Amino acid sequence: MKVRASVKKMCRNCKVIKRNRVVRVICTDPRHKQRQG
């Protein structure tokens, strides 16, 4: 899980979602998981 100021899609499988006012990226590749912090 990477914590970043700006979350971006890193591949075509990445999805940007909002969960409890937190922007997250979920992906099939676990190294691409991010959240905004």
Swiss-Prot record:
Coiled-coil annotated residue ranges, if any: none
SUPFAM superfamilies per UniProt: Ribosomal protein L36 (SSF57840)
MF terms in GO: structural constituent of ribosome
Entry GO terms, CC: cytoplasm; ribonucleoprotein complex; ribosome
Gene Ontology BP terms: translation
Top-rank taxon: Bacteria
Keyword Ribonucleoprotein attached: yes
UniProt cross-references to InterPro entries, sorted A to Z: Ribosomal_bL36 (IPR000473), Ribosomal_bL36_sp (IPR035977)
Cystine connections: none
Keyword Ribosomal protein found: yes
Keywords: Ribonucleoprotein, Ribosomal protein
A Pfam family reported for this protein in Swiss-Prot or TrEMBL: Ribosomal_L36
Record-stated family: Belongs to the bacterial ribosomal protein bL36 family.
HAMAP family registered for this protein in UniProt: Ribosomal_bL36
PANTHER family from the UniProt entry: 50S RIBOSOMAL PROTEIN L36, CHLOROPLASTIC, LARGE RIBOSOMAL SUBUNIT PROTEIN BL36C
Protein name: Large ribosomal subunit protein bL36
